[in-house]
């Protein structure tokens, strides 16, 4: 910075000196001109007459020369000032370049110093770490030295004891001590390994179950025991009841469903614990309303027709569920059996949806463990199929399911899965265990089942089974939410007098075998029909 100031000052001084030099020269020229003028005037005085013209000429010449000299001097001064300015600028430029180079060198030197400082810091840290490590090693060596000294003292003491023993006795003592130490160490390691394996197994199982539950979004609606049928107007209620209640009695006796007609506008309630019978009654009632012809013969015709239609719908439900679960080549009879589960509930949970859910969960778990996914899904889907027919065949749903699985030549893993999913038989495969876990997941999750609903349905089912256990009974239907049991008998086996006796026997068996609130009305119906055709 000082050099720059000096350069600027030098330039200013040069300019001042140049201007002063030019002024001096101009002054000298002026003085010379004045002197010449004076001489001319003197000569003019002497030779006035002759010199007037010459004096004028000389005067003009002097003026021209003075102007010429002034211009020349100005040009020379400007040229010198220009040259001097260029020299100063050149020097200033070179000084500036030197300053830039100096700044660059200083910056590089600063970076170099910073790097060296960082290197020194890192080396200092490394040295501190090594020093700490050496200190720790020194402490460890001291501790080991103390242990060695202690062991030497113990060995000396042992040797003093062994000195009085034979070689065999000494060897036996040493082997026993070594065995005790190794046994303790091995036992500790085994316990640690078992604890670690158990923890990892539990964690893995929880992860698998959590993943399976997150990947399955099942839909579920709690099953009901009533169905509402909407009427076009309230006048239809009288036609449904019929003359002296013939129509409604015929519908109830053929379907086993309680038809409730109350003050609710334009609605008839169908109540019954068997979803298949309730659905047949709903289809029949809706067909009667749409057709307009409501009488006992038409009711019988539509009930029979809707029973056949229900068989087709059951097959369609089974096919849709088998397609959803991915169970190809399923026997047609098994498809129909699975379709019937759409109308079965377990603790209020739809059994067909439960079976599909178990199949999907078992497939997810099998995929995580590298097992056969398709077989796991099939086994999970079929595990509860015995519930579809356990009312018609003796035995638990597990035994019935095993029998039908063997009958239709299902895979042995599927048979064992059905047999073991409630713990009655030991599982023979990983898939059987996975299906049992999936079954527990599906049924035990909050909201899946309703204990009170299942108890209610079981009470109605037991009520019907008591009635049908007597010889000569054709059908029995629990009505009025279990407050009435209506029994249809075979007229060729049961006489009018035996009807009264049968009602008393049924009442006594109900009182001894069932727990129920209030009273249960037992109604036995014997109907004799004679049909002939005129030709």
Curated annotation (Swiss-Prot):
<dbReference type="GO" id="GO:0005886">
    <property type="term" value="C:plasma membrane"/>
</dbReference>
<keyword id="KW-0694">RNA-binding</keyword>
<keyword id="KW-0812">Transmembrane</keyword>
<keyword id="KW-1133">Transmembrane helix</keyword>
<protein>
    <recommendedName>
        <fullName>Ribonuclease Y</fullName>
        <ecNumber>3.1.-.-</ecNumber>
    </recommendedName>
</protein>
<dbReference type="InterPro" id="IPR036612">
    <property type="entry name" value="KH_dom_type_1_sf"/>
</dbReference>
<comment type="similarity">
    <text>Belongs to the RNase Y family.</text>
</comment>
<dbReference type="GO" id="GO:0004521">
    <property type="term" value="F:RNA endonuclease activity"/>
</dbReference>
<feature type="domain" description="KH">
    <location>
        <begin position="225"/>
        <end position="285"/>
    </location>
</feature>
<feature type="transmembrane region" description="Helical">
    <location>
        <begin position="4"/>
        <end position="24"/>
    </location>
</feature>
<dbReference type="InterPro" id="IPR022711">
    <property type="entry name" value="RNase_Y_N"/>
</dbReference>
<dbReference type="InterPro" id="IPR004087">
    <property type="entry name" value="KH_dom"/>
</dbReference>
<dbReference type="Pfam" id="PF00013">
    <property type="entry name" value="KH_1"/>
</dbReference>
<feature type="region of interest" description="Disordered">
    <location>
        <begin position="118"/>
        <end position="141"/>
    </location>
</feature>
<keyword id="KW-0472">Membrane</keyword>
<dbReference type="GO" id="GO:0006402">
    <property type="term" value="P:mRNA catabolic process"/>
</dbReference>
<keyword id="KW-0255">Endonuclease</keyword>
<comment type="function">
    <text>Endoribonuclease that initiates mRNA decay.</text>
</comment>
<dbReference type="InterPro" id="IPR006675">
    <property type="entry name" value="HDIG_dom"/>
</dbReference>
<dbReference type="InterPro" id="IPR003607">
    <property type="entry name" value="HD/PDEase_dom"/>
</dbReference>
<dbReference type="Pfam" id="PF01966">
    <property type="entry name" value="HD"/>
</dbReference>
<dbReference type="Pfam" id="PF12072">
    <property type="entry name" value="RNase_Y_N"/>
</dbReference>
<keyword id="KW-1003">Cell membrane</keyword>
<dbReference type="GO" id="GO:0003723">
    <property type="term" value="F:RNA binding"/>
</dbReference>
<dbReference type="InterPro" id="IPR004088">
    <property type="entry name" value="KH_dom_type_1"/>
</dbReference>
<dbReference type="InterPro" id="IPR017705">
    <property type="entry name" value="Ribonuclease_Y"/>
</dbReference>
<keyword id="KW-0540">Nuclease</keyword>
<keyword id="KW-0378">Hydrolase</keyword>
<feature type="domain" description="HD">
    <location>
        <begin position="351"/>
        <end position="444"/>
    </location>
</feature>
<dbReference type="InterPro" id="IPR006674">
    <property type="entry name" value="HD_domain"/>
</dbReference>
